[in-house]
């Protein structure tokens, strides 16, 4: 917008390998449309545990902890908790910056503060259970036994339903919808007819705008 002042969008993407295979699964594909910051060439970018004075540092640090947390969560139950807690601390400190994207409880899916709350709130514990079981007990099993891995993924969707029932507007559902929906449909295409119909019904309830993708499950 002016010298040293920038308005941008950020696409945050992270992937992880699936055990004993060449397949790579996406953990986050998140678009942040409220990224405003000041930067002077040569300026030192340091993260403090006490205060924040630069939104560029705040946003990059925040998403770094979210990405690391999602990765750890996919390998061990609640393994990402320390990193999500740090992201929440950054979101709280960023309130002093008075910049877009950090407004508390905005109800918007692309708000960093609301994402941090969702990742740390007790009401979202079903997400962490789903995330771990889907990846570690589901995807990571498929190379050894595709049927067993698929069944565990379908079983993990009970936690996805719990998340939707408790927080139907959770930004975590956006993350799942953007990274896992197509994958679930492809995996469940090999399920029984009864399983396919149950999965399709559940996904259409949770992701009503994604019918064009979900209804490929036949």
Give residue ranges: language-model regions.
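Short, solvent-exposed secondary-structure capping/transition elements
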Residues: 4, 21-22, 73-80, 189, ...
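Start-of-domain marker
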Residues: 1-11, 18-20, 27-29
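Extended amphipathic alpha-helical interaction segments
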Residues: 64-174
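A cross-kingdom marker for long, charged
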Residues: 139-218
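A mature extracytoplasmic/lumenal domain signature
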Residues: 12-14, 41
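Compositionally biased, intrinsically disordered linkers/stalks adjacent to structured regions
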Residues: 33-83
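Surface-exposed peri-terminal alpha-helical interaction modules
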Residues: 3, 30, 45-55, 144, ...
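Short, well-structured alpha-helical interface segments that form or flank functional binding sites
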Residues: 5, 55, 59, 175
């Amino acid at each position: 917008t002016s010298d040293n002042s920038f308005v941008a969008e950020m696409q945050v993407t992270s992937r992880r390998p699936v055990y004993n295979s060449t397949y790579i699964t996406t953990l986050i594909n998140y678009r942040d449309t409220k990224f405003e910051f000041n930067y002077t060439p040569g300026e030192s970018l340091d993260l403090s545990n006490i205060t924040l004075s630069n939104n560029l540092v705040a946003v990059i640090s925040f998403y770094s902890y979210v990405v690391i947390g999602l990765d750890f969560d996919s390998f061990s139950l609640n393994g990402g908790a320390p990193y999500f807690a740090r992201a929440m601390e950054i979101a709280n400190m960023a309130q002093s910056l008075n910049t877009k994207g950090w407004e508390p409880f905005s109800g918007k899916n692309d708000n960093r503060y609301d994402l941090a709350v969702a990742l740390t709130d007790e009401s979202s514990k079903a997400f962490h259970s789903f995330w771990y079981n889907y990846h570690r007990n589901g995807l990571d099993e498929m190379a050894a036994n595709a049927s067993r891995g698929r069944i565990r993924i379908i079983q993990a969707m009970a936690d996805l339903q719990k998340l939707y029932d408790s927080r139907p507007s959770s930004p975590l559902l956006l993350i799942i919808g953007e990274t896992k929906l197509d994958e679930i449909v492809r995996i469940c295409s090999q399920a029984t007819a009864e399983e396919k119909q149950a999965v399709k019904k559940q996904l259409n309830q949770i992701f009503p705008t994604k019918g064009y993708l979900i209804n490929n499950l036949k």
